[in-house]
Each structure stands twice: as C-alpha cells, then as structure tokens.
Amino acid sequence: MDVLSKSSLKELLAHLERTPLEEAISYKIGTIPYQNVLISRNEYYNQPYPDVTSLIDGVAREGQRNVNGLIMSIISYVVSGSGHYIPNIGYTLLRRSILDILTKHDTGLNTNNINYDMIARNLTVSKMNCEQRKRMLICFKLLAYKDGNLNDYETYLNQNISLKQIAPNFIPGDMRTVMSNSDKLSIVGIPAYRLTQSTELSIRDDNAKSYKIGYVDWYNSSSFLREGNDFNLISLKDRDNKYVRLNGW
C-alpha cells in the first residue's frame, strides 16, 4: 500500500524543481563518499578535456565515477539536507534544477548505469528512517523512469523487501497515480544523520573500543529519534506558493 500523500509528493518535487544543483553540493572537502571502483584508462583519455578532472581519483568529470558521486550527493541532500563534495562541475549544470537532473535528458549526464544498491549502501540506508528511505526511492524512481530502467528498479526493490513495502507507487509526471494517504515525509535531523555516517566511518576505519562504546551510547539516546529541522518540507520557515506549485505535473 502506498503511504505517500499527493500533496507531500508534489511539494517535494516542486522544491526540487526550484532548487539548483548547486544547493546539493557541499564545498567542504572530505564529505565525499568512498567507494571501490575500477578505473578504465580509456574512460580517462577518451574525454574531450582529460585535464579537467574531478573527485579524488583523477577521472574526467564526464566519467561514470563522477556521475555516481553526483547522484549520491543529490540524494544525500534530498534525505538529509546536505550534499557531498563534488568539484569542477560546469556552471551551466550547477544552475540546472535538481528535478531536471533526475528527470530530463538534456543535462549532459548519462545516468543510465546507476547502481541503486551501491548508492543506497554508501548513503547508509540502514540508518535512514522510513521517510528518508521513501525520499531516496522517489529519486531512484524518477531516474529509472527517465532512463528506461524500471526493470532494474523493480529488481532492486524485489531484492530489498523492506524497501519494496514502503516504495512510493506513482508514475512521474502523472499525479493522478498517487494515492491520497497521510504522510508528512518528515526526516531525521541533519546533525543526527551526519553523526551516524561519521561514527560508522570511524568504526570501519579504526576498530577501537571507544568508538563502539560512543556509537552504542549515541544510538540508544534520544538523538537517534526523529527531530525537526529546517529541511522538513512540510513546515519550511520561508514557505510560500513557489514550493507548492509544480510545472507540468
């Protein structure tokens, strides 16, 4: 059963339609997610401007590695209000809206080879609450619909039954397909989500007992519970009509 309300989905999409990609990029070095990748020499040297590189491994910014990082940054912003560090992105692309990146083909980004499972794991999906996971799945659904990868999206859901049970059931571009049930899409506080990620990285990189004790103490504290923040789209402090009108939907 779909637990996403039509009004909250439209408000989320309207916000992303009016938010430039630049807002989803962190200019703080050190926030990029780590992932193991196999770098092809051809991918680097076949780029028109191989000296214009991005990320930490020297791959040209048009390469698949950077596309994955960019999509992860967008989804991180959508679920937590804070993106990752993605340098050397062209100004034109930075000014495109987040919704354009997720739904349109004229951005110059080839998102056809996105690995949903890898992105979800790198964003610590296991520590997201229900509403955060739904926001992530909304982004996946938009990308799958744009790229014609709905079969891959459905396969990912079938391999993750807990996500399939909460996956928003809608057709991008057609709000009539959304069931009108109550859901505020509220999310866990940004500091709490970030603390989850940083603590898990500490545990993974340095298996010290003190880290584990700190993690358990924090996990069992009230900080892990859902808390309000400025990114809750239902109660934006500067909320006005521009966040509830969605063009073309």
Curated annotation (Swiss-Prot):
<keyword id="KW-0167">Capsid protein</keyword>
<protein>
    <recommendedName>
        <fullName>Structural protein VP10</fullName>
    </recommendedName>
</protein>
<dbReference type="Pfam" id="PF07322">
    <property type="entry name" value="Seadorna_Vp10"/>
</dbReference>
<dbReference type="GO" id="GO:0019028">
    <property type="term" value="C:viral capsid"/>
</dbReference>
<dbReference type="InterPro" id="IPR009930">
    <property type="entry name" value="Seadorna_Vp10"/>
</dbReference>
<comment type="function">
    <text>Forms the virion spike 'foot' and helps anchor the VP9 spike 'head' protein in the virion.</text>
</comment>
<keyword id="KW-0946">Virion</keyword>
